[in-house]
């Protein structure tokens, strides 16, 4: 052991027996080339030529130094980063195999790979037997783990899993850097849907078999990639130790011990003292790899969920029997069915009020059906409850009839009250007409020639009331509105003239005739036209002027469409001549129209201010 200068780390010396001073530079270049390029076999051949054969102590020391230097290189550190993927692939393959075989104990990855490839080859030959399946079966039988993975779905030309594994295989064989991502690993899980052209009962098993084989190949390829240099060095170390007749060595410390046991005469020969860091004397890179491989690894919940999502879990026969046994123990015996039916509840009885109000017919029918069913079930011949119920209904009906007879006068009173209400409604409408007429008088006084416009306004109110009062047969309001309009147009007065009692009786007769049924529709129309003529003659009301809506209504009834398909009472032309009789306000209407036309001609549009 030699110590370096002050402040430098402690070093250790390893003698390289048989290395001349002239060959030291060539020896160092060979080791540096190995650390840079990684050409293990080429470097070992160069070292063998320097020592004139394999059975030499200097070659043994050189191989151990070479292995120790590789353990501290960046290349080896990168390969150690792949160890996690190796453990992941190993654990995933074993888990898939357990799911496939449905057992608890774990099996080695070699046994898993051999069993899965044999089972897959058997399924392809027996179930399909096509040319592609036969070729794949023969490839699987020759496969030893470290080879280019084939496409495990022979009926498809391309497979993402086979493409990814082929890339990993090429990188490992060329001893290049390998980087595996989680997203790339997901393509190794094959779903049952991808085997759609196989039998449905085979798809689940094919999915588990192919997924398991994919992870087995990933494990074997990456493991070979990590052990590539170390396995070659260890092989030559073992061969050299065998030729020298010494036990195999794996570290620099073991080499120092071995060379220290040799005779001093052998050590005095040509030798080179190689200095190494003291912390690397007992370092074995192969033991570090084994320590990484022996670490306990647990799959993440995401990976377990991915495995479970491939094929739903099926219960084994033992689990089915265990569950059935527990169900039998937890099941309680049900009570025996009763020998006789349970007693029926008493029938429902409806209590009807004596006020004369009877419920809906549907309620009575439903109650009768329920009571009839209940009574029929107890006594087919007839039950007293059913008779009693009919008696109650008959009593209530008789009471209702008596109430109806007793209230006959009341109904007449109600009818008279209804007529009084109609008269009050008519009076209210006439009052509103008088208010409209009074407003019209005020407009006449303020505007001079505004009498025609107010008269027209009064008739428009009469039109609205006429349209609304058709349902109430309100013809008085129309007559009063027309009279007010005509009186205001002629004299400018208030329009509150007395009505002829004869015309009132005629109006009532016409209203009664109009309110008859549809069978007397033609007669009602005739009487209505006759009433319109008399009203215009008596009150001075012009239907064509005062009630435009009324004209449209009568025109539709007389000269328009006849629902019964009969000829109208008057022709349209005769009816128009009848409506366009001698009207005292015809000239004023023309005058007002002429004013509007002048304003329209002068300005081009009508202005409300004018």
From Swiss-Prot:
Compositionally biased spans, kind Basic and acidic residues: 384-393, 563-585, 598-610
Coiled-coil annotated residue ranges, if any: none
Pfam family, any one: DUF832
Regions of compositional bias (Basic residues) in chain numbering: 586-597
Disulphide bonds in the chain: none
Biased segments, Acidic residues type: 394-447, 458-469, 477-495, 503-523
InterPro entries: Herpesvirus_BRRF2-like (IPR008550)
Gly residues: compositionally biased ranges: 448-457
Ranges for region Disordered: 327-353, 373-610
Segments of skewed composition (Pro residues): 335-348
Family membership noted in the UniProt record: Belongs to the herpesviridae BBRF2 family.
Record-given protein name: Tegument protein G48
Biological source species: Equine herpesvirus 2 (strain 86/87)
Gene: 48
């Amino acid at each position: 052991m030699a110590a370096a200068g002050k402040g430098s780390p402690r070093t250790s010396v390893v003698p390289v027996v048989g290395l001349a001073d002239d060959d030291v530079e060539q020896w160092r270049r060979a080791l540096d080339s190995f650390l840079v390029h990684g050409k293990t076999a080429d470097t070992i051949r160069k070292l063998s030529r320097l020592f004139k054969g394999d059975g030499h102590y200097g070659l043994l020391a050189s191989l151990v130094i070479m292995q120790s230097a590789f353990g501290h290189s960046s290349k080896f550190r990168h390969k150690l980063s792949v160890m996690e993927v190796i453990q992941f692939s190993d654990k995933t393959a074993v888990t898939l195999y357990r799911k496939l075989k449905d057992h608890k104990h774990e099996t080695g990855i070699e046994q898993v790979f051999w069993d899965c490839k044999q089972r897959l080859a058997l399924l392809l030959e027996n179930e399909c037997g096509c040319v592609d399946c036969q070729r794949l079966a023969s490839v699987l039988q020759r496969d030893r783990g470290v080879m280019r993975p084939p496409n495990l779905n022979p009926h498809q030309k391309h497979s993402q899993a086979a493409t990814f594994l082929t890339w990993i295989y090429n990188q490992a064989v060329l001893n290049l850097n390998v980087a595996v991502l989680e997203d790339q690993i997901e393509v190794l899980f094959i779903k049952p849907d991808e085997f759609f052209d196989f039998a449905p009962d085979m798809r689940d098993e094919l999915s588990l078999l192919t997924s398991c084989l994919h992870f087995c190949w990933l494990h074997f390829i990456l493991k070979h990639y990590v052990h590539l240099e170390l396995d070659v060095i260890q092989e030559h170390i073992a061969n050299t130790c065998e030729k020298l007749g010494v036990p195999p060595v794996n570290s620099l410390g073991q080499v120092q011990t071995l060379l220290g046991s040799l005779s001093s005469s052998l050590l005095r020969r040509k030798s080179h003292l190689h200095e190494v860091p003291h912390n690397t004397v007992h370092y074995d890179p192969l033991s570090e790899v084994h320590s990484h491989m022996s670490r306990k690894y647990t799959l993440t919940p995401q990976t377990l969920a991915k495995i479970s999502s491939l094929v739903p879990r099926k219960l084994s026969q033992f689990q089915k029997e265990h569950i059935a046994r527990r169900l039998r123990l937890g099941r309680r015996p049900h009570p025996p069915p009763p020998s006789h039916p349970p007693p029926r509840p008493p029938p429902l009885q409806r209590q009807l009020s004596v006020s004369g109000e009877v419920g809906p017919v549907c309620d009575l029918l439903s109650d009768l059906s329920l009571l009839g069913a209940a009574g029929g079930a107890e006594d087919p011949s007839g039950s007293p409850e059913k008779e009693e119920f009919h008696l109650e209904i008959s009593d209530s009906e008789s009471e209702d009839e008596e109430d109806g007879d007793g209230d006959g006068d009341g109904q007449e009173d109600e009818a008279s009250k209804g007529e009084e209400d109609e008269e009050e409604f008519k009076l209210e409408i006439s009052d509103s007409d008088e208010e409209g007429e009074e407003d019209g008088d005020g407009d006449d006084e303020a505007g001079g020639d505004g009498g025609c416009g107010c008269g027209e306004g009064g008739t428009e109110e009469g039109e609205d009331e006429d349209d609304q009062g058709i349902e109430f047969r309100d013809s008085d309001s129309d007559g009063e509105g027309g009279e007010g309009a005509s009186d205001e147009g002629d004299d400018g007065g208030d329009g509150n003239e007395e009505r002829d009692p004869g015309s009132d009786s005629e109006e009532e007769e016409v209203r009664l005739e109009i309110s008859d049924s549809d069978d007397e529709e033609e007669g009602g129309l005739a009487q209505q036209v006759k009433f319109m003529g008399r009203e215009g003659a008596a009150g001075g009301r012009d239907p064509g002027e005062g009630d435009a809506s009324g004209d449209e209504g009568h025109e539709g009834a007389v000269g328009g469409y006849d629902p019964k398909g009969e000829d109208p009472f008057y022709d349209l032309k005769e009816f128009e001549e009848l409506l366009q009789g001698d009207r005292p306000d015809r000239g004023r209407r023309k005058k007002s129209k002429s004013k509007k036309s002048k304003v329209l001609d002068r300005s081009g549009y009508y202005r409300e201010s004018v």
